């Protein structure tokens, strides 16, 4: 499979930033007439003096433009997950604001409005965050025995697990290299890191896995690994080479049969050429060894010296061609 294209956050900035303040969306709000989004405070302040969209100049509403704007929670979650540290910094600003202005009306707001929501509650993971994970050997037979397992088997399963604390930006490829070096697995075997029964791609980070499989932080991120041999392709290539060598040996034996005393007898084998088809020499670097005579192929045999001795030689005397025999 082809690797998934990964783009930079700067390429997505036009879709994540407010044109009114130039920053990333905070409390993203969308105009329902044209679907352009802005920060909530930015668009509310703008619509106090205008009734048109700041981007496309479409009329939001004739008299009450605030009726045609909606909070976009999905877009805001995307911004928080794509921009590292944005959610944590925003929550800190809100806590500092209400601490400096205790008279501000925050009782009617939600915990997020007051800045009292942690990253864990929002399920937002940053690149520098440390993720706890557990990894164990994937055994298909163990899964089949789950129905009839006895009291000692759960202890074995617990002992097989290993617990790690890794940064969220760590990739599956790094985890595979760690397992190979830690367990001395030779290079002739391939390691697959899995979530449940699905192999994970090498470029997945732990943060990607947590988002894709909706990790709830109610325990370590459960991962598994399996080891399998990687020499299958080499076996296929060896078989192909063996077939090729066998074909060459068979063609050589066919040419030898043509020069043998029984070579003049017609053969029913499909490996031999037809009388009208010239046979190429099995030694391309010496094309003069094989020649086509009367539709049959002759190749060097045990008496090839006598054939060269009886072969006529051409010589040129005063521009005329004369043929002499040895």
Swiss-Prot record:
Question: For this UniProt entry, what's an example GO CC term?
Answer: ubiquitin ligase complex
Which one Pfam family would you cite for this protein? RAWUL
Q: Describe the processing and modification events after translation.
A: May be polyubiquitinated; which does not lead to proteasomal degradation. Monoubiquitinated.
Q: Where are the zinc fingers (RING-type)?
A: 18-57
Task: Cite the record's Low complexity compositional bias ranges.
Answer: 266-278, 290-303, 315-326
Tissue expr: Transcripts are found in thymic lymphomas bearing insertions of the gene. Transcription is low or undetectable in mid-gestational fetal liver, neonatal and adult spleen, and in healthy lymph nodes.
Disordered: where is this region? 236-326
* The keyword Kinase is assigned to this record: no
Q: Which GO terms describe its biological process?
A: chromatin remodeling; negative regulation of gene expression, epigenetic; negative regulation of transcription by RNA polymerase II; positive regulation of ubiquitin-protein transferase activity
GO terms (molecular function) for this protein are: promoter-specific chromatin binding; zinc ion binding
Which InterPro entries would you find in this protein's record?
RAWUL (IPR032443), Znf_RING (IPR001841), Znf_RING/FYVE/PHD (IPR013083), Znf_RING_CS (IPR017907)
Judging by the UniProt lineage, the source's domain of life is: Eukaryota
What switches on its expression?
Down-regulated by oxidative stress.
Physiological role: Component of a Polycomb group (PcG) multiprotein PRC1-like complex, a complex class required to maintain the transcriptionally repressive state of many genes, including Hox genes, throughout development. PcG PRC1 complex acts via chromatin remodeling and modification of histones; it mediates monoubiquitination of histone H2A 'Lys-119', rendering chromatin heritably changed in its expressibility. The complex composed of RNF2, UB2D3 and BMI1 binds nucleosomes, and has activity only with nucleosomal histone H2A.
Q: How does it assemble?
A: Component of a PRC1-like complex. Identified in a PRC1-like HPRC-H complex with CBX2, CBX4, CBX8, PHC1, PHC2, PHC3 RING1 and RNF2. Interacts with RNF2/RING2. Interacts with RING1. Part of a complex that contains RNF2, UB2D3 and BMI1, where RNF2 and BMI1 form a tight heterodimer, and UB2D3 interacts only with RNF2. The complex composed of RNF2, UB2D3 and BMI1 binds nucleosomes, and has activity only with nucleosomal histone H2A. Interacts with CBX7 and CBX8. Interacts with SPOP. Part of a complex consisting of BMI1, CUL3 and SPOP. Interacts with E4F1. Interacts with PHC2.
The identity of this protein, by name, is: Polycomb complex protein BMI-1
